Amino acid sequence: MLSVVEGIFIFVVISESVFGVLGNGFIGLVNCIDCAKNKLSTIGFILTGLAISRIFLIWVIITDGFIQIFSPDIYASGNLIEYISYIWVIGNQSSMWFATSLSIFYFLKIANFSNYIFLWLKSRTNMVLPFMMAFLLISSLLNFAHIVKILNDHKMKNDTVWHLNMYKSEYFIKQILLNLGVIFFFTLSLITCVLLIISLWRHNRQMQSNVTGLRDSNTEAHVKAMKVLISFIILFILYFIGMALEISRFTVPENKLLLMFGMTTTAIYPWGHSFILILGNSKLKQASLRVLQQLKCCEKRKKSQSHI
C-alpha cells in the first residue's frame, strides 16, 4: 500500500509523462507534416528525431520505475533487467545524440567568432552538420558495443541475482562506464553553450557601444538560442541527479521514496525541454497557437450548442 507522499510522487510522474508525450508528439507531428510536404529542414529532422527518442525514453523511465516500485522481485530473476538496460541505453543515447546535434546546430548558425576554422565550419553548416552527427552516431555505437560487453561480463559473474549482489563500489563504477556516452554528449553540449554565451556577450558589448543601444535581430536570435541551450543544461543536470538517485536506490532497495523522487526529477528533462523548444521555435510556437485557437473555437461551439 502506497503512502500519501508516494501517491503524490506517482501522480506527478504520470503527469510529467503525459505532458512529455504530448509535447514531444506535437513537435514530431508538426515536422512530419512538413516532411510530407517535402519541406523538412535539417533542424526539422533533428527536432523530429529528438521528439521520437524522448517519447521512447519517457516510456522506458516509467516502465523501469513502476517495475521497481510494484514488482521488484521480477528484477531478481530472469533476464528482464538485462533487456531494460539495453533499451534504456538505446533511448538515452539516441536522445542525447539528437540533443547534442541540436546544440551544435544552434552554435554554428548563431555564434560569431573570427576564428578561421569556425568561419569555415559556419559557412558549410549544412555540409558539416551531417558529418558531425555521423561522428557522434559512430561514437555512440562504439560505446554501445562496450556497454554490451560490460553487461554480458557482469551477467556471467552473477547467474542468480543479476544486479543486487554487486559491491557498491563496483556497481557505481559500472554505472559510470555505462553512461560514458551520455557524459560525452553532455560535455560537448556544455562546451557549445559556453561558447555561444561568450559570442553573445561580445555581441552585446559591441551593441552597447552603439549610440542607439537597440538590439538587432541577430542579438535576439542569440538570446533565444542561449535560453534554449541554458535550459537544456539546467534540465539535463536535473536529469543526471534523477538518474543518480535511481541508481543509488539499488543500494537501499527498501527505500521506494528515493526511487520515486529520482523518477520525478528524471522525467522533468524530456517533457520540460520539449515545451521550451516549442516556445523558442517560431514555427512550432505558431502551430501551437493555432491548435489552441482551434480548441477554444471548439469549446465555444459546444457551449453555444448546449444553450440551444
From Swiss-Prot:
Pfam entry (one): TAS2R
Extracellular topology ranges: 1-6, 64-100, 148-179, 249-257
Stretches assigned to the Cytoplasmic side: 28-42, 122-126, 201-227, 279-308
SUPFAM superfamilies reported for this sequence: Family A G protein-coupled receptor-like
Chief subcellular location: membrane
UniProt keyword list: G-protein coupled receptor, Glycoprotein, Membrane, Receptor, Sensory transduction, Taste, Transducer, Transmembrane, Transmembrane helix
Family statement: Belongs to the G-protein coupled receptor T2R family.
Entry protein name: Taste receptor type 2 member 10
Lineage, highest ranks first: Eukaryota, Metazoa, Chordata, Craniata, Vertebrata
Gene: TAS2R10
